[in-house]
Amino acid sequence: MRRLLCLLLCLCWLPAISLTSARAADKAAETPAGLPAEVRVVSEVWVNYSQADGRGLAWDLLRAIYEPEGVRLSLRSEPYVRSVGLVQRGEADAWVGSYRNEIDHIIYPHWPYDVDPIGALGLKTSPRPTLATLDRYRLAWMRGYAFDRYLDHLKQRNELQRRSSALPMLDGHRIDYFIDARPELEEMIEAKGVDASVYHITDVGSIPLYLGFASNDRGRALAKLYDSRMQVLYRSGELERIFARWHWPYAPLIPLLPPKE
């Protein structure tokens, strides 16, 4: 009977011991400042921006933001829609390339980290559109991209699963223009086997880019640190040096950043 009582008492203590161990593990995974020991960031693969090998403007910028504060960058490459889902489920802390308030129940920092130049890719035989005339044409862009929420006249569209579908659809006259960030459009028509001379890209707008953080305590802490460090990098000139290292346009971001004091 005594042995049974002792066993029951031990079983009663197990949840408390497990909870204490979990809390200790969480505490060990924090920096001395109480921040998470790592920031888990997920992104679609973009050349010279967020490559799967850890190279690119976005990855260098995030290392400069977090690692001096003892927070290690843990990166992961996934398609855009899956990246958003991982953050929504708390399996990642943030994703790269969000537009502000694009997704509900996500924490957006105050400061953007880049500006997305948006272009319309079409056949050279097609007229050059303006933002005001785009609604006259058959448009397409990548699934999950919310261009229609941030640029007027982008209502009717096809959503594509793969960028590789865009050029055949243009060539077959199934769409008139493919909408995307200009660097992506340039990469498409500069690819091997593509005759760039039959296409043209028209700039139609720009949209500030943010990290989208998970709506939890980790996300709030990491977003707060991001805003603080962005100001430091901007005022020290390090932010501009990171952009220069990757030959990335910096001037469009300057009006959106805090004033230098």
Where are these regions (language model features)?
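Flexible hinge/capping segments at coil-to-helix
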Residues: 121-139
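Bacterial N-terminal signal peptides
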Residues: 6-18
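Short helix-initiation/N-cap motifs at beta->coil->alpha
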Residues: 59, 73-85, 158-172, 184
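Ligand-binding clefts/hinges and TM-proximal coupling segments of bilobed small-molecule sensing domains
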Residues: 146-162, 196, 230-261
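Extracytoplasmic small-molecule ligand-binding "clamshell" domains
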Residues: 26-106, 140, 236, 246
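Periplasmic-binding protein-like
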Residues: 43-44, 115-118, 190-227, 250-261
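Short amphipathic alpha-helical coupling segments at ligand-binding clamshell hinges
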Residues: 57, 61, 133, 181, ...
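A ligand-binding cleft/hinge motif common to bilobed small-molecule-binding domains
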Residues: 85-89, 98-106, 176-205
